[in-house]
Amino acid sequence: MKISRQAYADMFGPTVGDKVRLADTELWIEVEKDFTTYGEEVKFGGGKVIRDGMGQGQLMAADVVDTLITNALIIDHWGIVKADVGIKNGRIAAIGKAGNPDIQPDVTIAVGAATEVIAGEGMILTAGGVDTHIHFICPQQIEEALMSGVTTMIGGGTGPATGTNATTVTPGPWHMARMLQASDSFPMNIGFTGKGNVSLPGPLIEQVKAGAIGLKLHEDWGTTPAAIDNCLSVADEYDVQVAIHSDTLNESGFVETTLAAFKNRTIHTYHTEGAGGGHAPDIIKACGSPNVLPSSTNPTRPFTRNTIDEHLDMLMVCHHLDPSIAEDVAFAESRIRRETIAAEDILHDLGAFSMLSSDSQAMGRVGEVIMRTWQTADKMKKQRGPLPQDGPGNDNFRAKRYIAKYTINPAITHGISHEVGSIEVGKWADLVLWRPAFFGVKPTLILKGGAIAASLMGDANASIPTPQPVHYRPMFASYGSSLHATSLTFISQAAFDAGVPESLGLKKQIGVVKGCRTVQKKDLIHNDYLPDIEVDPQTYQVKADGVLLWCEPADVLPMAQRYFLF
């Protein structure tokens, strides 16, 4: 017996050759592979397959998955496929075909009495987002980020201190200890960066040994060539990443000076376009260096008619500037350039900018990383057309390029890709389920370490889960010791060896960063283009390999007002 393709999609979700529109964008993805055996699909519910003696077998808990997501459409850097996903002990155990191996063929994921089921039919499954530019100004950011689909936050801060309002720095062992202890309370993977601005190694080493997973160089603390060189030397010794916000005012040198101070060592350049800070007007040149891992922050994503006006006000507040002081106003205006922001759109589409992050509450919005990424992808498709690597009638390669910017590439950059950043067997089961119509805007379900940490949920007093008001609420993995079992605190190997988790009484699972210093841009998936960038110092026009980069600002964006009426 055969059923129509439409009926099949309605029952089990799309299969090979079917196309799905992402939210209200002009982006379409096409299913490349289906792990299902047709006629042997598993689905839970009354009269459905996953029942005793049918799709559910008799195996003990040790031999079946704890949680099964059925018939999900996976979007990840490695493919766009339809599969069942099995989770065991908080990690992704299998991607394949679920069922009862006693009676069904080709089963790679055994289902038993110990298995919970999440229906993925008609849903999109992605890895949780990794935001690597966090100012930890207030703890409420964490819930905001989680509800947007972000499951890992990396950055620095101590709360709403003036230093934290401007810089992603948790300075010194005492503050590092307090923030690590505080992070035990949140269903989020968290790692902290220390202050990198010092010219002798001792103050940096003590921060790494206290738990810092990286060091941040910020112009507001003085990003001089001496500080850059010293910071990178310590990072090389202790295998932690360095992030940099370079010298907008060009006081201690120009972009060439900073690039020379890197001495070909690996570094993550924040907001590499420059509106968020960095050598004016040409920090964007850095994205052409093989040792530079370039990212954007989300307020310039994508370039719209409102971008310039918004940025001037943001900058005055975030960097403690005084609008009555002419030099402060000139400093602000030097950072905001239409030409380089427009070029940033195109450099993302070419894969020259490799990552996207928030800059939370410090010229960025913590809950909009994912949304702004896909808005940029949509704008570029409309303005530049399909990418050469895309298949006929689909945007699969573009989708893989853009999802990598906030999942696998930041994870690789900061030495945590062995734990998070993609849907791959063995990794922490930080997973996000989306209805296609709400993709990138409002997730349906967020899993942390294999347990549901947050979800859209209706009235708790209703007779079913769906009545209004439906809004985001923390779920059971956000509470008690379940939180500690399902989320990670990242620290350096030096801190782990020094017994920092035990000495501070940390209860969350501990992840150790590794491989930070060997990463090169060529390792950043689908985003490794190394253009030769020129910036005209008078007009700010940007050229990549001799080609002028310019695009018009958008007047209207998808994934915007129609999703936020309620």
Curated annotation (Swiss-Prot):
One Gene Ontology term of the molecular function aspect: nickel cation binding
Catalytic activity: urea + 2 H2O + H(+) = hydrogencarbonate + 2 NH4(+)
Residue sites binding Ni(2+) 2 per the record: 216, 245, 271
Residue stretches making up the Urease domain: 128-566
Free-text description of this protein's post-translational modifications in UniProt: Carboxylation allows a single lysine to coordinate two nickel ions.
Keyword annotations of the record: Cytoplasm, Hydrolase, Metal-binding, Nickel
Active site positions, chain numbering: 319 (proton donor)
Entry-linked InterPro entries: Amidohydro-rel, Metal-dep_hydrolase_composite, Metal_Hydrolase, Urease_alpha_N_dom, Urease_alpha_subunit, Urease_AS, Urease_asu, Urease_asu_c
PROSITE patterns attached to this UniProt entry: UREASE_1 (PS01120), UREASE_2 (PS00145), UREASE_3 (PS51368)
Compartments where found: Cytoplasm
Pathway connected to this protein: Nitrogen metabolism; urea degradation; CO(2) and NH(3) from urea (urease route): step 1/1
One cellular-component annotation, GO: cytoplasm
HAMAP family found in the cross-reference section: Urease_alpha (MF_01953)
Similarity comment: family membership: Belongs to the metallo-dependent hydrolases superfamily. Urease alpha subunit family.
Stated name of the protein: Urease subunit alpha
Native species: Pseudomonas savastanoi pv. phaseolicola (strain 1448A / Race 6)
Species lineage: Bacteria, Pseudomonadati, Pseudomonadota, Gammaproteobacteria, Pseudomonadales
